[in-house]
């Protein structure tokens, strides 16, 4: 799902929904006022788009230059962005980066270093959430720090894997394992890379080092032909930005808390939640598409070639836009949304819990980690609890339809496919909106008020299915189908 960083950026875009008039005084404060945004919001938006000229500078003046120059450029530009947005509070990220380097050097490739990193970085982030918490989204230093926290935890695990026997590692772990010893400058450049410092995406140290060495290009020895792919993602991001800016005054989460919403018919309350649930995610889509374009332009988005020779620029993709817009399944939305963060959790949390021997338990603990990483508000826990519940029920329903001859035949009727799709999408986005209500309102008094107004529909619906579908499965699936499945 979305992160705290994503929520802060989303609030930024929500604030920037004025008529965009021209201004004569270009001071940040007056410009922000004329745009209907806060100065802090304008600084953030400016910083995200600043990645494009920085990437162009890197391409034309630093590509294939000495590694230390590239690390210095990335570290200095990222620190400058941090200072520009958060003033002296940029020291929080700098402190964690330096201490992380010391942990790697002093503790080495040990499990102790991994646990120390996990405990320290998460504790620092959660303490930041606690001491800066308010009832609303604020643009503060914890926004990029949650992105940095995952980077540094992943760095420690990859460094630990680099000291293990290669044969004991999976192919994925071998790909990310760090064989060398990172210098402080390398860790700083990796941490402060301008295209991902504020809102992501996540990427590994090994991938970053390939960028520094000039290996992330479709034309060896030359700059990558990534300008057009980068502009395509930027253009798509701008389309979402314009759409969100125009519609955001009319579709707000604040309306969910109004008396007018409470007095509307039940069907209206559900339909508003459905539309809002789809629309609210567009603010995250916008930011990820824009930052993906920065990563592509610099070369970091290079991901090799297809079998037919087509270049892939999706190494830093956080969105699969077509899948996101068309999938009728909750798991489809999860697979298309915040891809790199989800991949990070799968790689470093979910798969590392394999020793538990229970996939559902591993999934539940992974989602609990995600909820805590987002923040200390109860709404995050409720949102990811709903995701866990919905995914289990969706899997039950899929198995039932697949294994039941009657339901399988009914589902395969071509003439009814549009109707099925409409029903699926309605259920899908209604309960995505239901889950996002807790995520976006995040304090218990707010999300509880909205859930009461629709009678806890999401919990009632999915908990009922969770307990009844196994009995329906027993009744509708012949014994031979069950035996075949076991085989």
Swiss-Prot record:
The keyword Membrane applies. It comes from the Eukaryota. Its EC number is 2.3.1.-, 2.3.1.23, 2.3.1.n7, 2.3.1.n6. Its main location: endoplasmic reticulum. One of its GO terms (cellular component) is membrane. It is a multi-pass membrane protein. The modification N-acetylalanine is found at residue 2. Lysophospholipid O-acyltransferase (LPLAT) that catalyzes the reacylation step of the phospholipid remodeling process also known as the Lands cycle. Catalyzes transfer of the fatty acyl chain from fatty acyl-CoA to 1-acyl lysophospholipid to form various classes of phospholipids. Converts 1-acyl lysophosphatidylcholine (LPC) into phosphatidylcholine (PC) (LPCAT activity), 1-acyl lysophosphatidylserine (LPS) into phosphatidylserine (PS) (LPSAT activity) and 1-acyl lysophosphatidylethanolamine (LPE) into phosphatidylethanolamine (PE) (LPEAT activity). This is Lysophospholipid acyltransferase 5. The lineage of its organism: Eukaryota, Metazoa, Chordata, Craniata, Vertebrata. The gene is Lpcat3.
